[in-house]
Amino acid sequence: MSIVKKEGCFGMKIQAVLIDGFKNLSNVKISFANITALVALNNFGKSNVLAAIDFGLEFIKGAIDDKAEMMANSNLIPINSCMFGRNYKFEMEILTEINNIEYQVFYGYEFSWKCNENMKPYIVSECLRIRPENTGQKYTQLINRDSRKALYKRSETGRCSSKINVEPTELVANKLRAYDEIFYADIIRKLNSMKFYMENNLDAKSFYQPDPIIRKGLENMTIDAENLPRVIYQLRENNPQKFDLLKEVYKELFPDVEDIIVKQYMINAGVNDKLPLDVPFMITNAIHVLFVKDKNLKHPINFAMMSDGAKRVFMILTRIILANVANVSLIAIEEPENSVHPSLFQAYIQIVSQLLDDCKVIITSHSPYIVSYLEPSWIHVGVNEQPGIAKFFTFKKSGQRLLQQDAADFKMSTGDYLFSMLADEESNWGEYLECDVYE
């Protein structure tokens, strides 16, 4: 099975994650469609799922000292009496393409939290397996680690039996970055550079302000850049096709918009305006302003004058297009319905789905109306199996039809019926969901 790094390698297409032992999350398995929705009542744990995914990916990329600090973060350690101090577990199922062959990748690790001053956190287990997609072949083990030993597969024809020395808070996947000769070096590189973006800015106003001061590291077109007009200018200059696509889909949602214009204004930043080298900011020699031309107005207006919903929709569409450019594996959007009229939301979600390439989107909501515009197969419902512990379940295929039928019988929308069940502790979820939540 040759997977030597060659030209034409693609990013990591995340298919599923499993999270356990993070705040109030217990064995949460999320299988990703293009768009995946976490639906639950307020204060249930939807945001914890997003935070746990972010934490899991950041832990892979973190330095050894940073990992030790992360493993001692008391704000994240489970404190529910039913799962106090439970180990953190993070597993991913991924698709990646190498040399025109698609591979299934399974990677996961587990560590022990530092629950008190006397405990030393350590990585309990780690595993990496791969197999060609749709071939029926068995997985090939590349990393096999437990609390006593760490092993890796050195050659394509050998077994996963070569010992490797790692620190208690170091991942084998980190150590193998220096092993350029191993045949799966490209997968190791990709694992260590997976990207996740969290969009939880419910007020987008500040992102439209022209500002010559920018954070170092965000000078170029990045998905998490805070200066949106500058990002749009760079998109127009560096990737005009993507810029045209952004304008096209936005005008689909807002038909009165005729054009989106971005202008650059040069400024003279004098010597006295330069910041010290050790500050995390820099002063550029230009500011950028975004304008929108509306068919009902005599002249273009500053985009900052648009409604809150119009600004947030444009910002999110921009992030998604940038995600495809930058090989971001997953974007999380909290409350995408915020400030968006219900009549617009269905078209908005359809456009988001169509824009996605290898990137996936996960959204959270506690709004009944959003559910009515989502495919039931996209939805993971948050249900308490034990008090205070969050679990999420998908619908059975028969449960999807039953939910729609029962909602119609009660003359309710699917979303209203679903949330009425969530609010009722006596609801019988077993008929609807993939597993028995009361077993």
Pin down the residues of each PLM region.
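Phosphate-binding glycine-rich loops of NTP-binding sites
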Residues: 32-75, 126-128, 313-314, 319, ...
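C-terminal lobe/lid and adjacent interdomain/linker elements of RecA-like ASCE P-loop ATPase modules
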Residues: 7-11, 346-439
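N-terminal pre-Walker A segment at the start of P-loop NTPase domains
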Residues: 2-26
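C-terminal structural cap/anchor segments
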Residues: 310-312, 316-376
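Conserved P-loop NTP-binding catalytic core
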Residues: 2, 7-10, 50-121
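Conserved ABC ATPase signature
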Residues: 248-254, 259-321, 330-343
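Phosphate-binding P-loop
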Residues: 27-33, 323-326
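Electropositive, glycine-dotted interaction segments
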Residues: 103-258
